[in-house]
Amino acid sequence: MGADVLIEQEISYTINFSQDLLYLILDSYIKKRCAAPAERYTDLYDANNVRTRQTADSAVSVHKTNLRDERFVHWLRSSNALVPLVRRENRETAVPHDRVSRHIASLIETTVYKLDGVDVKFEHVYMQSGPADRYESTAAHKIAALKTALLGVDCARPSQNLQLGSDAVLARVRLELEFEGAAPAAASLDAFCELVVQMETLADHHNIAPCLPYTTLLDSATPRRFTREQRIAYGAQAPDSTGVKKWAFKLDGVRGRGAFRRGYCLVQTDDMQLHAACISSPFGLNNVVTFQCEVVADKIFVTDLLQVFRYKYNNRTQYECNLHDAYPINADVAVECLNRLHCAVGSVPWPGLGELRFQQFFDPPLAPTHYTTIPIDGYIVLDEQLQYAKYKWLPTVELEYDAPSGALHSIDGPLLGKTVVADLQLKHGAVYECAITDNAINVLKCRPDRIVPSKVC
């Protein structure tokens, strides 16, 4: 790269609290740990998104282009916190002063504090204009977001749903960790997340819990797909463990999705049963964590952690949860966190149902099963590529029963020429889990959590 071009990589986190809480964090935490700021400057953005940074003795103008904007979740073991972070890669290109527009779009005054190698930026936004300002106030933010999505343009400074006037100055707190290479050091990332947890803990007594659209939230919790299914041969001492990173028993229950929030947990199963309880969230940060689960009799087993949704603050609508900005949890992070919860928490009483538990994952090799206290029908395997596979002794499919013809149907049509073997009364239009052999279809159980039959390969 030339002298006028700079590639910058950083991990970023924004503290999303009201103004009074941000100043509380500044006075009671940041200033006590770092009495003197490391740097002060003022950023001016023109109409072309060129940033001019003015310090006490210099002024430099650059145009920042976003090359990478990736959301991820880091698990902080010390406090069992799932910290939602953003990894950014930007290209900064120097701009001559005579090419900077005279029209100022934003003016931000920033004070930078250095804590454990992390830049803690306390910002005062004196002016901020954007595409939303030209529309009616109640719908402006949504219209601007829609235009951005339709045009396919990523904004380096995304519009915020805020109102600034002559008597309003918006405060913001941002944490940034700059790094070089493929990824930041694990110790640096842990120290970064420790700062996040310690700062946000100062707001715990405010019990921030905005209203949530639970149906939309659970619909957003998409379970991971199985990339393959492998049959286990009968009589083998243990299945082949080649390429296995972690494994767990495949529970034979009703699948569901749920969400943890502080003081409350909600579960919806695939057969449209709802379970809710006022229980404490096991995680260190006040966020929404979605999960996949399996309901077996009177027990709910959390089998996977899927996403983190953050609460956000603006001075128009106060606190809200943006369900369009999910932070995905990697499969290996979810497995490590579940193992920690299995050992540290064990079971949580669930009033009116039974209890909530966390599934345990094991290191290879896969162990043969002789006796278990809960029904299982195989293994769940996480391979070295962090893809899920299921190992079963008897691969099954979901088929729909058609009473007039007396046949079972896949999604492609009736399966003819095979004997239907069933120990239960079959109902027209119901979906059943079945095992197909050369000459017969063995009906194992009814699947009220399935609406349509599956494909038979």
UniProtKB/Swiss-Prot annotation:
Catalytic activity: a 5'-end diphospho-ribonucleoside in mRNA + GTP + H(+) = a 5'-end (5'-triphosphoguanosine)-ribonucleoside in mRNA + diphosphate; a 5'-end triphospho-ribonucleoside in mRNA + H2O = a 5'-end diphospho-ribonucleoside in mRNA + phosphate + H(+)
Chief location: host cell
Enzyme Commission no: 2.7.7.50, 3.6.1.74
Superkingdom field: Viruses
Region (mRNA triphosphatase): 1-199
Protein name: mRNA capping enzyme LEF-4
One Gene Ontology cellular component annotation held by this UniProt entry: host cell nucleus
Biological source species: Orgyia pseudotsugata multicapsid polyhedrosis virus (OpMNPV)
